[in-house]
Amino acid sequence: MPPKSGKGQKKAGKAKGAPRSDKKRRRKRKESYGIYIYKVMKQVHPDTGISSRAMSIMNSFVNDIFERIAAEASRLAHYNKKSTITSREVQTAVRLLLPGELAKHAVSEGTKAVTKYTTSK
């Protein structure tokens, strides 16, 4: 005799309710750094535009740098037997990954951003 509760039983057939064709399918959202790249570009060069291809390249670049910094910071935390990536690991990762003057500017801008964030809390 089959169990009376519906647990563990699979029913054949389609689920009841409105058919899928009636509903409008929503597109999956694509996340990107596009709006931020655009804002920074307008601060530096207010009269310049950017093509969608150039924006795609810049987005790939930002994603690549982000992944490299995250991987290096993770490695540094692991070497020091820490389970948390702090601003110190990120700063060291930036110093290791970026060359000379670019690293100095990135560290100073990062420090400025962290200070601004902590004071606004």
Swiss-Prot record:
The modification N,N-dimethylproline is found at P2. This is Histone H2B, sperm. The keyword Mitochondrion does not apply. Belongs to the histone H2B family. Residues 1-30 are annotated as: Disordered. Monoubiquitination of Lys-116 gives a specific tag for epigenetic transcriptional activation and is also prerequisite for histone H3 'Lys-4' and 'Lys-79' methylation. It holds the Pfam family Histone. It is found in: Nucleus; Chromosome. GO terms for molecular function: DNA binding; protein heterodimerization activity; protein-containing complex binding; structural constituent of chromatin. One of its GO terms (cellular component) is nucleus. Gene3D superfamilies: Histone, subunit A (1.10.20.10).
